[in-house]
């Protein structure tokens, strides 16, 4: 099979990369009615599989789970989760032939095997659903021409998808129809009904493409969402300890600092995050972020280039074929780092202390968010898509680090995201070491003293922060998410 994106001509590539339309709430007036009375079979009962299924059932849909025979016979975790929640569970052979919509929510590396198994069992004219388009775009999976292929991609972990639904809300969601597989022209109706059934229509839905979702998702998770947080954690911890900070305190400042800082980001973008600093600290954070952007821009561009060309995917799939040798080696090495093995700090760190003593961390967040956004937009991805794959998801990933450090982040994210994270962080850490050596007192671990600032300089910095394109689009998109619950649990 050939990478689907690479089979397109340039005009087609640009058209699919640039497909992004914010959908009006009136477009979801029919809710999930298009799928009511039809059989929806979910393959996979992980975080997305279970929680999307719970939401869809609560929205009145007929949901069941198709699992492998051995998973049922051995009563594995997927079988236990589905049965304990009262769902009908059966084998592929028992459930797939009756399904009107088969939703594949297994891990990326299992998609080819799953699709090749279920496709011959699917009835004529059925639909196949994904929540991530890697299998279609990067693997180039060929789907029977009578099958409609759609995507509904919530921009949150599965647990958040469920919690927001229970609150009567939802999470921002991308939907798409694969242009090669919409024989009856019903793909958009199916995707809209599925999105409504998960509650996504209450938080904002973007009509996108499989290509735009995959390329932007890969870029975001590799760079700012996971790679930058991992590289920043390791670099900042080592710097603090090198300068005499208690390792336990240093670990807590970083582990919970990302979450506290990005909670401000979630509520009011980069502007609010920077406004939490004193004026001297804001000017310093801005200067540091500009330096970081200049240093890291080529690395961000390389990741985007490798994602667009398919180089990243081919390398990762080669590692799949080699029993994940690189992934497992990197995972083991990360677990042995000083940050991951540092003792726990029993004292309390106040919320403002994370800002006052984390100026460098704030600069890293600002630089990483802006670079990821700018690089995606420069590559043809529309601003709304770039926002969701950079700034929007960052607080959610930071929250995983607050639970159990980098270990938890890498457990929760997909293997695809984890592989890309290591590629980025292993390149970024040595790249930034000379920069780290030149830091000034007050950049990390100590507060910058209050002092006089130049009014014109402060005015210009504030203007530059607020006028960045990500702040403009973010203000609009956050307007649809004002009811989402607060994430941070740091203390």
From Swiss-Prot:
Domain KARI C-terminal knotted: 209-344, 345-484
Keyword Amino-acid biosynthesis: yes
One example of a Gene Ontology biological process annotation: L-valine biosynthetic process
UniProt: substrate binding residues: 414
Positions bound to Mg(2+) 2: 217, 389, 393
Pathway(s) where this gene product acts: Amino-acid biosynthesis; L-isoleucine biosynthesis; L-isoleucine from 2-oxobutanoate: step 2/4; Amino-acid biosynthesis; L-valine biosynthesis; L-valine from pyruvate: step 2/4
Enzyme class: oxidoreductase
Keywords: Amino-acid biosynthesis, Branched-chain amino acid biosynthesis, Magnesium, Metal-binding, NADP, Oxidoreductase, Repeat
Cross-referenced PROSITE patterns: KARI_C (PS51851), KARI_N (PS51850)
Cofactor note: Binds 2 magnesium ions per subunit.
Pfam families: KARI_C, KARI_N
Entry binding sites for Mg(2+) 1: 217, 221
Active-site residues annotated for this sequence: 132
Binding residue positions for NADP(+): 45-48, 68, 76, 78, 108-110, 158
Function: Involved in the biosynthesis of branched-chain amino acids (BCAA). Catalyzes an alkyl-migration followed by a ketol-acid reduction of (S)-2-acetolactate (S2AL) to yield (R)-2,3-dihydroxy-isovalerate. In the isomerase reaction, S2AL is rearranged via a Mg-dependent methyl migration to produce 3-hydroxy-3-methyl-2-ketobutyrate (HMKB). In the reductase reaction, this 2-ketoacid undergoes a metal-dependent reduction by NADPH to yield (R)-2,3-dihydroxy-isovalerate.
Family, per entry: Belongs to the ketol-acid reductoisomerase family.
Cross-referenced PANTHER family: KETOL-ACID REDUCTOISOMERASE, MITOCHONDRIAL
Name of protein: Ketol-acid reductoisomerase (NADP(+))
Protein source organism: Shigella boydii serotype 18 (strain CDC 3083-94 / BS512)
Lineage of the organism: Bacteria, Pseudomonadati, Pseudomonadota, Gammaproteobacteria, Enterobacterales
């Amino acid at each position: 099979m050939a990478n689907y994106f690479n089979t397109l001509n340039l005009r087609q590539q640009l058209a699919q990369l640039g497909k992004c339309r914010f959908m009006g709430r009136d477009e979801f007036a029919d809710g999930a009615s298009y799928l009511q009375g039809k059989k929806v079979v979910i393959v996979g009962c992980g975080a997305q599989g279970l929680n999307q299924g719970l939401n869809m059932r609560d929205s009145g849909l007929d949901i069941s789970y198709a699992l492998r025979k051995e998973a049922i016979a051995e009563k594995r975790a997927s079988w236990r989760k589905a049965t304990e929640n009262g769902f009908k569970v059966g084998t592929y052979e028992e459930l797939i032939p009756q399904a009107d919509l088969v939703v594949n929510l297994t891990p990326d590396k299992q998609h080819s095997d799953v699709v090749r198994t279920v496709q011959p069992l699917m009835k004529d004219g059925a639909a196949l659903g994904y929540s991530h388009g890697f299998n279609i775009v990067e693997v180039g999976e060929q789907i029977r021409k009578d099958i409609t292929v759609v995507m509904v991609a919530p921009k949150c972990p599965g647990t958040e998808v469920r919690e927001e639904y229970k609150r009567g809300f939802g999470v921002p969601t991308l939907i798409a129809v694969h242009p090669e597989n919409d024989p009856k022209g019903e793909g958009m109706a199916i995707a809209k009904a599925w999105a409504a059934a998960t509650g996504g229509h209450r938080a904002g839905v973007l009509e996108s493409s499989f290509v735009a979702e995959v390329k932007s998702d890969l870029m975001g998770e590799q760079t700012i969402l996971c790679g930058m947080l991992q590289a920043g954690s390791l670099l900042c911890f080592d710097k603090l300890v090198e300068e005499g900070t208690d390792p336990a305190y240093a670990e807590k400042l970083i582990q919970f600092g990302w979450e506290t800082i990005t909670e401000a980001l979630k509520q009011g973008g980069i502007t609010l995050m920077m406004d939490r600093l004193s004026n001297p600290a804001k000017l310093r954070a801005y200067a540091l972020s500009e330096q970081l952007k200049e240093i890291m821009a080529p690395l961000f561009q390389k990741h985007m280039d490798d994602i667009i060309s398919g180089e990243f995917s081919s390398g990762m799939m080669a590692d799949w074929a080699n029993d994940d040798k690189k992934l497992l080696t990197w995972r083991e090495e990360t677990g042995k780092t000083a940050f991951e093995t540092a003792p726990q700090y029993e004292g309390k760190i106040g919320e403002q202390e994370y800002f006052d003593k984390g100026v460098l961390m704030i600069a890293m967040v600002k630089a990483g968010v802006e670079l990821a956004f700018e690089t995606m937009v420069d590559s043809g991805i529309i601003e709304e898509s770039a926002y969701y794959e950079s700034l929007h998801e960052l607080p959610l990933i930071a929250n995983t680090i607050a639970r159990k450090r980098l270990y938890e982040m890498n457990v929760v994210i997909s293997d695809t995201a984890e592989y890309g994270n290591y590629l980025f962080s292993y390149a970024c850490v040595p790249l930034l070491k000379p920069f780290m050596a030149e830091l000034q007192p007050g950049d990390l671990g100590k507060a910058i003293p209050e002092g006089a600032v130049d009014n014109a300089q402060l005015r210009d910095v504030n203007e530059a922060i607020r006028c960045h394109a990500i702040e403009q689009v973010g203000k609009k998109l956050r307007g649809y998410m004002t009811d989402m619950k607060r994430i941070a649990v740091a203390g």
